[in-house]
Curated annotation (Swiss-Prot):
PANTHER family: FXYD DOMAIN-CONTAINING ION TRANSPORT REGULATOR 6-RELATED, SODIUM/POTASSIUM-TRANSPORTING ATPASE SUBUNIT GAMMA. The keyword Nucleotidyltransferase does not apply. The chain crosses the membrane at residues 36-58. Residues 1-18 form the signal peptide. InterPro entries: FXYD_motif, Ion-transport_regulator_FXYD. GO terms for molecular function: sodium channel regulator activity. This is FXYD domain-containing ion transport regulator 6. GO terms for biological process: potassium ion transport; regulation of monoatomic ion transport; sodium ion transport. Pfam families: ATP1G1_PLM_MAT8. Regulatory subunit of the sodium/potassium-transporting ATPase which is composed of a catalytic alpha subunit, a non-catalytic beta subunit and an additional regulatory subunit. The regulatory subunit, a member of the FXYD protein family, modulates the enzymatic activity in a tissue- and isoform-specific way by changing affinities of the Na+/K+-ATPase toward Na(+), K(+) or ATP. Belongs to the FXYD family. It comes from Macaca fascicularis. It is a single-pass type I membrane protein.
Length: 95
């Protein structure tokens, strides 16, 4: 019985090798399916966009401390104050 099984398997081995060789010839490594790649990229972008919108609308990302509302030009004034404060400080001498 084992001999018959080995014989049948030995007959199937060349068939399997021949079919894999044909598949390798058919499969061109430089042939890309751009349509599927484009659709996959668009689906990925839509999912990320939707997750971003849901995060913004859910308001789960909150600061742990209360901030008072600032005027639109307040950030620029704060940066200018820091620049002038750093410019007027005396340089510390290092030993």
């Amino acid at each position: 019985m084992e001999l018959v099984l080995v014989f049948l398997c030995s007959l199937l081995a060349p068939m399997v090798l021949a079919s894999t060789a044909e598949k390798e010839k058919e499969m061109d490594p430089f042939h890309y399916d751009y349509q599927t790649l484009r659709i996959g990229g668009l689906v990925f972008a839509v999912v990320l966009f939707s997750v971003g919108i849901l995060l913004i609308l859910s308001r789960r990302c909150k600061c742990s401390f209360n901030q008072k509302p600032r005027a639109p030009g307040d950030e620029e004034a704060q940066v200018e104050n820091l620049i002038t404060a750093n410019a007027t400080e005396p340089q510390k001498a290092e030993n």
